[in-house]
Amino acid sequence: MEEENATLLTEFVLTGFLYQPQWKIPLFLAFLVIYLITIMGNLGLIAVIWKDPHLHIPMYLLLGNLAFVDALLSSSVTLKMLINFLAKSKMISLSECKIQLFSFAISVTTECFLLATMAYDRYVAICKPLLYPAIMTNGLCIRLLILSYVGGLLHALIHEGFLFRLTFCNSNIIQHFYCDIIPLLKISYTDSSINFLMVFIFAGSIQVFTIGTVLISYIFVLYTILKKKSVKGMRKAFSTCGAHLLSVSLYYGPLAFMYMGSASPQADDQDMMESLFYTVIVPLLNPMIYSLRNKQVIASFTKMFKRNDV
């Protein structure tokens, strides 16, 4: 009876970051610049790969899709944050919240699978170089890409489905700068223990599987590199894997800490700085990490601009 008489909430307040009023415009401009650079960098990388037929190979097909997912991840979070910097009210409707959570969950999960697939690609390239063209074909790459997106979609649908069993009546204040699953569950009027369990099981399983794939791949890669007698060969192998290892470390570090450490009703509020790092900063850095020392990408980028000038 109490639940029936309670007023259902359909709007929420995103608290966002705490800052002095005079910092509102500088913060808005800073995040706007970051977002624009992120979108230009990732879409630029996609354009370079799309335009150059020489880059239509598994390594760059995976990189192009990573850039697409990074652009989606950044957009799903940053656009609403930019609006809230200037808006008097930081309200978000329940439907908007679910849409944001859905797009966020798809992009985050898909990126996990993509990073694992890229690690496998590096394993085959370094440990089985002669068999690489036969094993890592474009057909296999496309199938792995489809599985990555399907995995992201299913994971998002699971959490969206379980959200429909919840009602929100008491508090409408989300202690975050976007609609993330954990802060939303914490203000649920309905018992959200099952939802927390689903987060722990599915998010945990995905992270264990993808991180495990990355670790196992690089254990074999490291073993193969150490067997190489040529210093030049070792440098080339490290150069091939360095960018991906850095990207994986930056992405999985805060992500694993947040979702494996906070998926319980008693856990403290999420550290928003950790969320900011992997939703805003990592998508900004990835195009630079993968492009600046990649001679093929730089050469293709230069060619594309020369053609445009002509």
From Swiss-Prot:
It comes from the Eukaryota. Residues 1-28, 78-98, 165-195, 262-271 are extracellular. The chain crosses the membrane at residues 29-49, 57-77, 99-119, 144-164, 196-216, 241-261, 272-292. One of its GO terms (cellular component) is plasma membrane. Residues 50-56, 120-143, 217-240, 293-310 are cytoplasmic. Keywords: Cell membrane, Disulfide bond, G-protein coupled receptor, Glycoprotein, Membrane, Olfaction, Receptor, Sensory transduction, Transducer, Transmembrane, Transmembrane helix. Its main location: membrane. It is a multi-pass membrane protein. One of its GO terms (molecular function) is odorant binding. Disulfide bonds join 97-179. Pfam families: 7tm_4. Glycans are attached at residue 5. The keyword Amino-acid biosynthesis does not apply. It is found in: Cell membrane. Belongs to the G-protein coupled receptor 1 family. Odorant receptor. This is Olfactory receptor 5H14.
